[in-house]
A protein has these predicted regions:
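Nucleotide and nucleotide-moiety/phosphate-recognizing core
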Residues: 2-161, 166-185, 190-204
Length: 204
């Protein structure tokens, strides 16, 4: 039984993946397993219920045994549409979102973000990563939010809002800085995927 039963985990796999050639990114192999499997394996100890946000290939995603939630908005409306789909189906106090294409995300992501949310009484906490030079980079799709933000998000989307940072600015939000920048490496292109496999010592 997870310590985080009050947190629903949402894997964002609903994008168009244009830079991956339009292939459904969650089903692309990484180190011998689809990216969605890596996401599930890292999330399963950090959340209670798990949802998968997908807008195609529902039958293939359903094989993993978790509910599939599609965007209400048409035409691949971006991660905020995925957030809205997850919040609409979220039955717990909090929703933790992660993208399907960052297979090395921190195993203490949920714990640290949950603590920050409680400490600051925020509506929403997002991750940031710090590189070797000390520069901090926002990682906004790694996000823990209270389910009460759904109304705000739906209103933002109805006004054709798409930019995550603009929606965050409407809420009480804060960030947690993770020093391991590599944990947030993503795989937007086939070359990035192969480079990340190589960095992990994987030889196909």
């Amino acid at each position: 039984m997870t310590r985080y039963a009050e947190i629903t985990g949402l894997i964002l796999a609903g994008g168009r993946a244009q830079r991956m050639g339009g292939i459904d990114k969650g089903l692309v192999p990484f180190m011998g397993k689809p990216l969605i499997e890596h996401a599930i394996n890292r999330l399963i100890t950090q959340a209670g219920p798990i949802l998968i946000n997908a807008n195609r290939n529902h039958d293939q995603y359903a094989q993993y045994g978790y509910p599939i939630v599609a965007d209400a908005q048409a035409d691949f409306a971006g991660p905020l549409a995925g957030f809205a789909a997850g919040l609409t189906h979220c039955k717990t106090e909090y929703l933790l979102t992660i993208p399907c294409d960052s297979p090395l995300f921190p195993l203490d992501l949920s714990q640290r973000m949950h603590q920050a949310l409680l400490d600051t009484q925020s509506d929403l906490v997002f991750a940031s990563s710090q590189d070797a030079s000390g520069a901090v980079w926002a990682q906004p799709v790694f996000c823990l939010m209270h389910r009460r933000v759904l109304e705000s998000l739906l209103s933002f989307l109805e006004q054709d809002g798409r930019k995550i940072d603009r929606w965050f600015a409407e809420l009480r939000s804060t960030t947690v800085v993770f020093e391991n920048e590599a944990a947030f490496a993503n795989t937007n292109t086939p070359d990035e995927l192969r480079a990340l496999e190589h960095a992990q010592g994987y030889a196909n």
